[in-house]
Amino acid sequence: TFVSQQISAQTDSIANTHELKNVTVKATNGIKSKYRVDNAEIIGQGQLIRAACCNLGESFTTNPSVDVSYSDAATGAKQIKLLGLSGTYVQMLTENIPNLRGASLPYSLGYVPGPWMQSIQVSKGASSVKNGYESTTGQINIEFLKPQGTDGVRANVYQDSELKTEVNLDGSIHLNDRLSTATLLHFENRQMDHDGNGDGFMDMPKLRQYNLMHRWAYVSPRWISQLMLRGLHDEREGGQSRKHANAASSELLYSTSVKTNRYEMQWKNGFTLNADHNTSIALMLHGSWHDADNMFGATQYDVTQKNGYAQLMFETDITENHNISVGASLNHDYYTEQFNPLGTLPEVESKVTKETTPGLYAQYTYKLGETLTVMPGVRWDHSNLYGSFFTPRLHIKYSPSNIVTLRTSIGKGYRSPHALA
């Protein structure tokens, strides 16, 4: 007997079109991670793109947690305030290496173009002892665009009603799976007199800046190396406007002039010794040469700062809950200052300052899941000018629930004072 069944095939079809609901794209605010032991906020590119043109100082205009104000409106110098204290107590870092300090601090917020930044990390209070002893009220770390990021070329041009012009160009090339390089260019020009209140003084200085950065990155499973070279030329002219109606042709107008040349080199190396225990060793080197010629009316002040910094770090997880980090650092500053209070004196006061500071640090971290983190640390440094000093710091984070996180930090901070630089 033969039995047969009818088999029917079902035909499926896929629609060629599909209508989506409305999608709204918005820039994101700064991100605060509840898992970090320090009180840190990360400002990413989603918030940085809110400003059509910006530099580091202008990027905080949309962030209420950082107060940026003019310390000298005539020259355009700005400062950051954290916890109510001025920027001299805020440590500046570029990719976790101390930078933009000393003679470069007054105008440092204008030295970092906005399109170059990948993110900004703002920490309030005493920071980790890994990065030195200079953080008192907080720390700002700048992460630049990485060569191993998007391959290609990007460009943007900006001009406003005051004829301020900005040109930014960056491009990266992936030579192979491990090696990549990138070049970033920035040009800024503002030459119009701006006197909104009609008092005869320019509200902001005329500015011309050329900025160049070149980077290399090598990334392998056990070794990461990053090299950065950078050059900057910055000119600022301010003071009384020549368009002032009350200024006679024979009247000597008050003017300010700041001409700066700055060069940097930064080399970071990280070696993974044991991936299971996150055991690694890192070597970081940084050098800078900063030269500024300043005229404030009849007062002349010229300064040159040469800085060298080296740091060696070792870090490992002892167990799942215990981590230890130890390291050594060496910082050297060489200042050459020339001061002429009247600009006509036959002899100019000169001063040379040399400071070398080696240091050691140790930091321990205890983590109990996502509930409790305790991170004590201590460092010892010795300055040839001020002797030895200890910097103890303690960070505690406690999260009793998913919506509540409590943090506290206790610590000391130091800085070397310079009357003019």
Residue ranges and their predicted role:
Residues H244-N246, T336-F339, N384-F389, I396-Y398, ...:
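Surface-exposed extracellular loop regions of Gram-negative outer-membrane beta-barrel proteins
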Residues Y111-G152:
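A beta-strand signature from Gram-negative outer-membrane beta-barrel systems
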Residues Q10-I49, G57, G87:
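Short, acidic, small-residue-rich periplasmic hinge/interaction motif at the N-terminus
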Residues G57-P98:
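Extracytoplasmic beta-strand/coil segments of soluble accessory domains associated
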Residues Q79, I97-K124, L212:
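Short acidic/polar hinge/loop motifs at secondary-structure boundaries
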Residues R190-M213, A217-N278, G287-Q305:
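Flexible loop and strand-edge segments within Gram-negative outer membrane beta-barrel domains
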